[in-house]
Design a protein with these regions (language model features):
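Conserved PLP-enzyme active-site core in the AAT-like
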Residues: 59-212
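Short, hydrophobic/aromatic alpha-helical segments in well-folded domains
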Residues: 37-40, 50, 64, 97
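Hydrophobic/aromatic-rich, well-ordered segments within soluble, folded domains that form packed cores
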Residues: 31-46, 102-103, 198
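Short, mixed-charge, low-aromatic patches
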Residues: 16-24, 49-52, 165, 206-212
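Short loop-beta-helix segment that forms the pyridoxal 5′-phosphate
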Residues: 22-26, 30, 43-63
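Gly-rich Lys/Arg/Thr-decorated short loops/hinges at beta-loop-alpha junctions or inter-strand turns
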Residues: 12-24, 42-47, 78-81, 121-127
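N-terminal entrance/gating region of PLP-dependent enzymes' catalytic architecture
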Residues: 1-36, 42
Length: 212
């Protein structure tokens, strides 16, 4: 840990002893740190809302799928729409967690090359990744627009540091942006997991997982 952070944050009593009168188990310093974290995530992803983190990136992606599942339109629920598309260049661990969570909800996960994806009304959502697991950067702005016109909800897994240089998914029109906060230089914590970030739009503020 850099000395300046150790002195001014980790060793600063104002960060870890200023207890709030209404919630004695959490310090004001932690609340401020979480607010700063959420503000950075919101700014980097170009999304209006970010939660206080989740377990890891794969968990965040699966939570996005479940949020979409519970946010289907009445017409989609009535029609029994249960397909969720995942691009095959998404991290394999993310795909595995999504499949596991989907199985017990009755969601049908389709994993394939995005080039083969024929977006139709039988899908309630889609997950793509940029940069993908191979480091390739693809701007999905046109695709996102087309998918949403067909009633699909769109999640994008992304890399925080890359968003300092490339167009953030929020500007594409994505509904959710997820990823790993380890890119900020967080320590390994005995091999992981790393904090997963989750950012979304105002429309999902009552559905988003975790703490706001």
């Amino acid at each position: 840990t850099p000395g300046v952070i150790t002195r001014n944050i980790l060793e600063n009593p104002g960060w870890y002893t200023s207890y709030t009168p209404y919630q004695a188990e959490i310090s004001q310093g932690r609340l401020e740190a979480l607010l700063n974290y959420q503000t950075v995530i919101s700014d980097m992803t170009a999304m209006p809302l970010a939660n206080a983190s989740l377990l890891d990136e794969a968990t965040a992606a699966s939570e996005a799928m479940l949020m979409f599942w519970h946010s289907r339109s009445r017409a989609q629920v009535k029609a029994g729409i249960k397909k969720f598309f995942v691009a095959n260049d998404v991290f394999p661990q993310t795909i595995d967690v999504i499949k596991t969570r989907a199985y017990y909800q009755g969601i049908e996960v389709i994993v394939d090359d995005i080039k083969n994806f024929s977006a139709g009304e039988e899908y309630f959502g889609v997950l793509v990744q940029c940069p993908n697991q191979y480091g390739r950067i693809i701007n999905y702005s046109e695709e996102v627009k087309a998918w949403k016109e067909k009633g699909m909800q769109v999640a994008v897994a992304s890399d925080l540091m890359s968003l300092a240089l490339i167009t953030p998914p929020g500007e594409w029109g994505a509904d959710v942006v997820v990823g790993s906060s380890q890119r900020f230089g967080l320590p390994m914590a005995f091999g992981g997991p790393h904090t997963g970030f989750f950012a979304t739009t105002d429309a999902y503020k009552r559905e988003m997982p975790g703490r706001i």
